[in-house]
Amino acid sequence: MSTSDFEERVVTVPLRDVSAVPTHERAGRAMTLIREHLAQHFRVDESDIRLDPSLNETVWARGSQNPPSKLRVRAARFDEDGESIVEAEPAE
């Protein structure tokens, strides 16, 4: 695997926009915002982004009504079968 086939970055995803959503939908909307933000920054389709379950647990840790206002995410892009895939997990 050459260096051009693998790229890893730590990205801060702003989640302030979830405050405009009804309270019972905020954590779900935050997950959608994370996926959209990573798709934009890695220039891939949203369906090519795989979110780690620990990222889901981090967003939902304070309940569905109070997700974090921003989140640091470690994302890695690699080529799989000629297609770019992005895997994301919370950065520590």
From Swiss-Prot:
A Pfam family recorded for this sequence: Ribosomal_L31e
Keyword Ribonucleoprotein among record annotations: yes
Residues spanning the membrane: none
UniProt GO molecular function: structural constituent of ribosome
Superkingdom of the organism of origin: Archaea
Claim: Ribosomal protein is one of the keywords in the record: yes
Record keywords: Ribonucleoprotein, Ribosomal protein
GO CC aspect terms: cytosolic large ribosomal subunit
UniProt-listed GO biological process terms: cytoplasmic translation
PANTHER family according to UniProt: 60S RIBOSOMAL PROTEIN L31
Protein family according to the UniProt entry: Belongs to the eukaryotic ribosomal protein eL31 family.
HAMAP family linked to this entry: Ribosomal_eL31 (MF_00410)
Protein name: Large ribosomal subunit protein eL31
Species annotation: Haloquadratum walsbyi (strain DSM 16790 / HBSQ001)
